[in-house]
């Protein structure tokens, strides 16, 4: 570290969007509080004191054909969860109306590699109703979509969500029924059409620091607008849970998670880094510190796990001096 004049070196490179992988590895050696301070300085450089709030509805749960090792909705895992087909559009609209008083964004999320024609058309109807009856920005996580579907979603001003989940070199350790390149192809197609894309991953799946940093740079190369960071929440019955239970991989620590979030922001200074699932379980009493480095927060319940009380999250944001919603 002696070759650098101090943390100002990293700050200057970050605001110029010029941090390289060597810089990112060196950043890891800094204390978590220094990294959070740096990330917050970068946020303030971009005149951002805001924490943009989003929420999701698990509109179709379980029975997924894909074998993602971390996912409780996969048929290849044995987790005990609620399974149900696509919810009626009335239920989706009801949830959207409820969350509007707290959130800017609302995402319709479904299980599965993709949606069939009937499901797709029903989701389109639900999106139109939400657009008509609320002021929410609408997002959708519908798996791998074709060109015509993406164009229709673009016309409706919908942001697409499609997580890479992890880096290219680690992807086949967590999923083999579809590929990393399948995801990249879908994201690239969406970007080419002009859609905004939210794509991030899950940290704490047993990946190395190098894997994690590579994921952040892969997202940077794809030029996605939003980067949701999830922290793996062990759910019994998933293969990743068994790896943790057998000590084949280590549980991520709160400090490791905070450092990863801060480094992500420093690598992607002009993008919206959003903290999502697993924060309650993994960060515990350290959750408020994450606000220094993030641009957005997912509130409410997640896919198959509960979030914490929304009012508590709002209070945390206000108490920290941040602007919410």
From Swiss-Prot:
Alphabetized UniProt keyword annotations: 2Fe-2S, 4Fe-4S, Biotin biosynthesis, Iron, Iron-sulfur, Metal-binding, S-adenosyl-L-methionine, Transferase
Residues the record lists as binding [4Fe-4S] cluster: 64, 68, 71
EC number, UniProt record: 2.8.1.6
Reported cofactor(s): [4Fe-4S] cluster; [2Fe-2S] cluster
Domain of life: Archaea
Pfam families on file: BATS, Radical_SAM
PROSITE patterns reported for this sequence: RADICAL_SAM
Broadest EC class assigned to this enzyme: transferase
InterPro entries: Aldolase_TIM, BATS_dom, Biotin_synth/BioAB, Biotin_synthase, Elp3/MiaA/NifB-like_rSAM, rSAM
Record-annotated membrane-spanning stretches: none
Pathway the protein acts in: Cofactor biosynthesis; biotin biosynthesis; biotin from 7,8-diaminononanoate: step 2/2
GO term, biological process aspect, one: biotin biosynthetic process
Assembly notes: Homodimer.
Job of this protein: Catalyzes the conversion of dethiobiotin (DTB) to biotin by the insertion of a sulfur atom into dethiobiotin via a radical-based mechanism.
Family, similarity comment: Belongs to the radical SAM superfamily. Biotin synthase family.
Protein name, per record: Biotin synthase
Organism: Methanococcus aeolicus (strain ATCC BAA-1280 / DSM 17508 / OCM 812 / Nankai-3)
């Amino acid at each position: 570290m002696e070759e650098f004049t101090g943390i100002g070196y990293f700050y200057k490179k970050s605001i110029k969007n010029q941090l390289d992988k060597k810089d990112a590895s060196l950043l890891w050696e800094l204390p978590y509080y220094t990294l959070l301070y740096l990330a917050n300085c970068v946020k303030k450089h971009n005149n951002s004191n805001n924490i943009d709030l989003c929420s999701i509805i698990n509109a179709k749960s379980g029975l997924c054909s894909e074998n993602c090792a971390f996912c409780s909705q996969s048929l290849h895992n044995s987790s005990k969860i609620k399974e149900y087909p696509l919810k009626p559009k009335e239920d989706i609209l009801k949830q959207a109306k409820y969350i509007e008083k707290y959130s800017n964004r609302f995402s319709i999320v479904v299980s599965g590699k993709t949606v069939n024609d009937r499901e797709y058309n029903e989701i389109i109807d639900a999106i139109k109703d939400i657009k008509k009856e609320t002021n929410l920005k609408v997002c959708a996580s519908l798996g791998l979509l074709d060109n015509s579907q993406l164009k229709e979603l673009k016309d409706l001003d919908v942001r697409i969500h499609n997580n890479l989940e992890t880096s290219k070199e680690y992807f086949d350790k967590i999923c083999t029924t579809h590929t990393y390149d399948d995801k990249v192809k879908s994201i690239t197609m969406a970007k080419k059409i002009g859609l905004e894309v939210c794509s991030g991953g899950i940290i704490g799946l047993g990946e190395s620091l190098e894997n994690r940093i590579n994921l952040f740079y892969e997202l940077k190369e794809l030029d996605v607008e939003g980067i949701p960071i999830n922290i793996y929440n062990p759910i019994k019955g998933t293969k990743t849970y068994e790896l943790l239970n057998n000590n084949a991989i280590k549980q991520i620590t709160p400090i490791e998670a905070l450092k990863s979030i801060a480094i992500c922001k420093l690598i992607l200074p002009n993008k919206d880094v959003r903290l999502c699932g697993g924060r309650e379980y993994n960060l515990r009493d350290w959750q408020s510190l994450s606000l220094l480095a993030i641009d957005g927060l997912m509130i409410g319940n997640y896919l198959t796990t509960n979030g914490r009380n929304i009012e508590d999250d709002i209070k945390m944001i206000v108490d920290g001096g941040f602007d919410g919603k």
